Amino acid sequence: MKKFVSILLILTFIFTLTSTVSSAYGTKSVAEGSLTTSSEHTVNARSAFLMEAETGETLYSYNENERFSPASVTKVMTLLLIMEGLESGKIGADDNVTVSAYAASMGGSQVFLEEGESMSVTDLIKCTVIASANDAAVALAEHLYGSEKTFVTKMNKRASELGMENTFFENVTGLDDTTTNHLTSAKDIAIMSRELIKYDMIRKYSSLWQDSIRNGEFILTNTNRLVRYYDGCNGLKTGSTDKAGYCMSATAKRDGMQLIAVIMGAETRDVRNAEARSLLDYGFANYALYSLPERMLEEVPINYGSKGATAIYSAPFKAIIEKGKKENVNMIFEIPESIDAPIREKEQIGKVIYKLGDNVIGESSIYSLDNIEKASIGKLFASIIKSMFY
């Protein structure tokens, strides 16, 4: 029977900052409720949500599950499916798309595509990301799945896969003059935004203030003014209609921490921008992303193995911690005194539990570095004889 030793180390340390995503290495995200979020911070909007992107930790919420019309913030999901289509090879960035009459007929924000006009997927993405062009969004949707109707079915399927419990899409643009159930929530917008900003192309274009298409003849200006005026802002999407009010998913990164601030239903563009700035300011002022890299630990003895011990290492760890409290972080190592062979390389043999005060803020796995088979009977017998005489 394996005996586990819990070693409590109370450390005063500064975590090494890193932007490497650690979920693939066995790091468990911060436990819900382990952070103290402000009940005093208020927003002038129908709903709001603040998330840290790497851990998915909620830093602020207000009416976050209430369903409202998102206007052009809808295009976060539209663009996510396009990025996934590029990633899978279903479409190519250099594909030339012939604009349909339906795509060219889109009103609202647009780049005035004409029926029969040819434009590359990359340029259509730029138009959608930077200028929030409805005609470009529809052209992309038709290119990937043949029709907007089929594309919307895929949007709703993807929303379900992501756990967006309060979302239903009726089109790819967010135009809501004739929609009856095209709704989502601030939390769901943050969830799909978190997925979208994983893509380099999105981060590249959503952080630009201006770009151009048609050989420089048509200037694209970002609908997100925070890109120009807010330090660290790198996206993401704005939207407004009479029904939706003024909405935004604003992303910004400082000191290695990527925040997503969602505002829904503000009364004016200026109010929306101010509330998004205020929410981002709150996040950067009160929280920080700290991390520990992958690191080697002491060897663990192996019983009945072809090798007497295995080196072990702990996976990287990331957590959001309230500023000023890092000195209170404790680490509990749960490591077996010994392990019976066979064991496999990267086999989990223990874990590190991280605590801040009484709250568990996360844990990371401890793995074996070696692949050790069970020793043969002859080798075991030889080891016994050797131990008797030496």
Give the ranges of each region predicted by the language model.
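Residue-level preference for short coil/turn positions at secondary-structure junctions
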Residues: 9, 44, 345-348
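Hydrophobic alpha-helical segments, especially transmembrane helices
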Residues: 3-4, 76, 254
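Active-site-adjacent loops and short helices of periplasmic peptidoglycan-processing enzymes
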Residues: 21-200
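Sec-dependent N-terminal signal peptides of Gram-positive bacterial secreted proteins and lipoproteins
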Residues: 2-23
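Structural motif marking the loop-to-transmembrane transition
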Residues: 1-2, 70, 121, 377, ...
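Domain-terminus/edge residues, biased toward the C-terminal soluble/receptor-binding domains
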Residues: 164-168, 180-390
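Residues in and immediately flanking transmembrane alpha helices
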Residues: 15-16, 88, 291-294
